[in-house]
Design a protein with these regions (language model features):
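Metallo-beta-lactamase
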Residues: 1-44
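Alpha-helical packing segments of well-folded alpha/beta enzyme cores
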Residues: 17-20, 57, 114
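Functionally constrained cores in energy, signaling, and assembly domains
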Residues: 18, 47, 126
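Histidine/acidic-residue-rich catalytic or RNA/ligand-binding cores of hydrolases
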Residues: 43-52
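Generic structural signal for well-ordered, non-membrane alpha-helices
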Residues: 52-59
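C-terminal regulatory/interaction regions
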Residues: 59, 63-129
Length: 129
């Protein structure tokens, strides 16, 4: 199994998401039943993978905000590239048996939506004094 954080518009809050995963893991579940999917085992491995991807999304996003504070269109374009690179690498590292190009093709909608969600989050926190 392979999972990744959803950062789709407009609800992405990395700290709240991280806290939710940590609360679930504190209960030491044997398995999970993600919405729209069946049972998954290997919960500790999946949680670690999920949190590592979340950390990467957050760090990359904050770096982009620092580099491009006033250029939302350029941030979105860069976010699409970063999200794509992160998700494709993560899927392949988890054993997905396809080429990087095919993984990118299969993840295209998720890449687009997650980049948009990251862009909304960065715009929101970029306005915060």
């Amino acid at each position: 199994a392979w999972i990744f954080p959803s950062t789709t518009p407009v609800q992405f809050e990395p700290e709240a998401l991280r806290s939710s995963v940590q609360r679930m893991m504190a209960m030491q579940p044997q398995c999970l039943y993600p919405t729209h999917f069946g049972r998954v085992d290997g919960v500790e491995r999946l949680a670690a993978q999920f949190l590592a991807t979340l950390d990467r999304f957050e760090a990359d996003g904050l770096a982009l905000l620092a580099r491009l504070p006033d250029d939302a269109p350029a941030r979105l374009a860069a976010l699409k590239e970063q999200v794509a690179a992160t998700l494709v690498a993560s899927a392949l590292a988890a054993g997905c048996p396809v080429s990087p190009a095919r993984a990118h093709e299969l993840l295209a909608l998720d890449i687009e939506l997650n980049a948009q969600g990251m862009a909304v989050w960065l715009s929101r926190i970029g306005r915060t004094p």
